[in-house]
Amino acid sequence: MDFVAIDFETATARRDSACSVAVVEIKDGSLQGSFSSLIRPPENRYAAFNIGIHGITPEDTAEAPGFAAVWPELAAYLAGRVVVAHNARFDMGVLASCLAEAGLRAPTFFYADTVAIARKAWPDLENHKLGTVGAFLGIDFHHHDALEDARACAAIPLRAGERLGETGDLCALAQKLGVRVQPFGGLRRGWRR
């Protein structure tokens, strides 16, 4: 199974306020590579609520690169790939908003939501939050650290594929589960900037 998992953390409720990003690349069902970076959000402004979630502060990102500087390396992982995210609407909205804010073109790739994969693969779980699914799968990780969340997210389709005997192709797994794999098209209606 080949795909990329992505996770963003944001500094405020605005989707263009990414302060951390991570991607992990899965090739033939194994971790092939990863990339993570702190990102200086616009004006390096943070909301206390968001700091309480991920612990990243303005001091942490004062000297961090902006999204545009991180983009070339991030884009290399995404272009032409199938990408997964846990609650993909959020992460795809962050990506689209950051691209729009920086005046950058959206890459061509497809994405699926690991919340939907988990709901179909393990419908009896109490909920399908990343922490709950991770605990069920025995994944030890520090939630709301972008790299650790991306790794935990990547484990979901791998483990669902093992459970269902569909370890070769993420799109085939998604089809078997009735989960949509859709094209990323940049900023869409309904995504707050």
Locations of regions flagged by a protein language model:
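Short secondary-structure capping/turn micro-motifs that flank functional sites
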Residues: 67, 115, 150-151
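A short, structured active-site edge motif that brings together acidic residues
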Residues: 108-118
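Acidic, divalent-metal-coordinating active-site segment for phosphoryl/phosphodiester hydrolysis
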Residues: 146-160
